Amino acid sequence: MRYLLIAEYRISRTPLEPDSLEHQRVEVRLSTTETAGEGLFARTDFTTGDLVSILNGTRCSPSLQDEWSDYKVNFNTGLDLDIPHDMRRTDQYCTTLAHKANHSFRPNTRWGRMDHPRFGLVVTLLAVREISVGEEITVNYNYSLSVAPAWYRDCVARQTQCGE
């Protein structure tokens, strides 16, 4: 099977071409979380274990010296996936959409992985409970507090807001 080669600095040759596995499942809209900006929403009903969304990104080696990115997800000990600064808006990149899912301490999805037919190994969001059409998709970012951004540390400290 041939995959589109994803270089370290190039997320996709076709960054505005929707992924056929994902775009019938979710859409991006204004988040219901006041300070979050955009969010990811269900376009169909999901049951526990269903594939909800996909996250493709540039491939890079994990490093504590790199600039912090809220869009970087650890795939394994040797690989991170990141959405570059110039690809974070949906008018710049919308091939996959999981990077638009907001954080919650009581999420309706969890992280997963799959071998995608177009991109190879990618991160996924899998339903942890039933999700209804129109419901916002959330995931626990699970940041290590030693490297987490201030907003996340604040949420941990007060776990009554920020998606509890």
What does each model-found stretch correspond to?
Residues 3:
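Glycine-rich phosphate/ribose-binding loops and adjacent secondary-structure elements
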Residues 105-164:
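C-terminal SET catalytic tail plus cysteine-rich post-SET Zn-binding segment of SAM-dependent SET-domain
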